[in-house]
Amino acid sequence: MAPEENAGTELLLQGFERRFLAVRTLRSFPWQSLEAKLRDSSDSELLRDILQKTVRHPVCVKHPPSVKYAWCFLSELIKKHEAVHTEPLDKLYEVLAETLMAKESTQGHRSYLLSSGGSVTLSKSTAIISHGTTGLVTWDAALYLAEWAIENPAAFINRTVLELGSGAGLTGLAICKMCRPRAYIFSDPHSRILEQLRGNVLLNGLSLEADITGNLDSPRVTVAQLDWDVAMVHQLSAFQPDVVIAADVLYCPEAIVSLVGVLQRLAACREHKRAPEVYVAFTVRNPETCQLFTTELGRDGIRWEAEAHHDQKLFPYGEHLEMAMLNLTL
């Protein structure tokens, strides 16, 4: 295989691997590129490699997605193969049969591969979906912020980090594994999301602060219930963060006002210490919402500047979405 062709195949396999482990929508997979390669070769090795990068991946075997998702993926893979080759590939049907025989769990997993060779895995109970929270979803801005953090570890090394609206915990878990913070505080107002967060912290080999058997080389990790509207200075002063982060929390005008308010109270808690650095990442869905955020910041005397856009390198998120991140000075 020519070097250019080999590089293209590796890129294709990586695309399938990262999207499948992260349980991205099937339409986001590089199906057209796969079909083109299948037409150019009668060899079934590529499909076998895709199976090893997806349903047979060690991370998937340990922390599988839902049976339904795996079945839909394999069905689509078989369809693409049959559209090009008349001879069926027994291995595809064997794996599909194994998937159909598997018992559906109440937990589904999404995994994100890290540049260190490790991964972050999120376990999500289907029971949470019906309770009206957004914490079950891993928003694209959380992936964008996590990727930025991994590229800029100096912002977090040996520092105390407070995350507002942690949701499933992807960003914080990536920072804890890759950026060596001294302490990390996950926070969210919803009790069901907090329960999920604690489970994901433990699932990824980290210990909660109350666990005296924790790894001394790992950051001190806390999961805190924090409602921006009712949190008083005495509660916020216990955190004493050096860095505050938030991703995709600008979803309505009320949330924006609440966010700016809690940031002001956090700054007041630092007394004679330097105010924390603040990074807020978001997907630009509605320019008016972004304008409202910067207007509210200006009204409260909070300066801001946009961080330079970074290219997608590690995590699979919407390629055509407009992402932004602001660095705030409290």
Curated annotation (Swiss-Prot):
The modification N-acetylmethionine is found at residue 1. The keyword Transferase applies. GO terms for cellular component: protein-containing complex. It is an enzyme of class 2 (transferase). S-adenosyl-L-methionine binds at residues 139, 165-167, 228, 247. Keywords: Acetylation, Methyltransferase, S-adenosyl-L-methionine, Transferase. It comes from the Eukaryota. SUPFAM superfamilies: S-adenosyl-L-methionine-dependent methyltransferases. It holds the Pfam family Methyltransf_16. Its EC number is 2.1.1.-. GO terms for biological process: methylation. GO terms for molecular function: protein-lysine N-methyltransferase activity. The keyword Acetylation applies. Interacts with EEF2KMT. PANTHER family: HEPATOCELLULAR CARCINOMA-ASSOCIATED ANTIGEN, PROTEIN-LYSINE N-METHYLTRANSFERASE EEF2KMT-RELATED. Belongs to the class I-like SAM-binding methyltransferase superfamily. EEF2KMT family. This is Putative protein N-methyltransferase FAM86B2. It comes from Homo sapiens. The gene is FAM86B2.
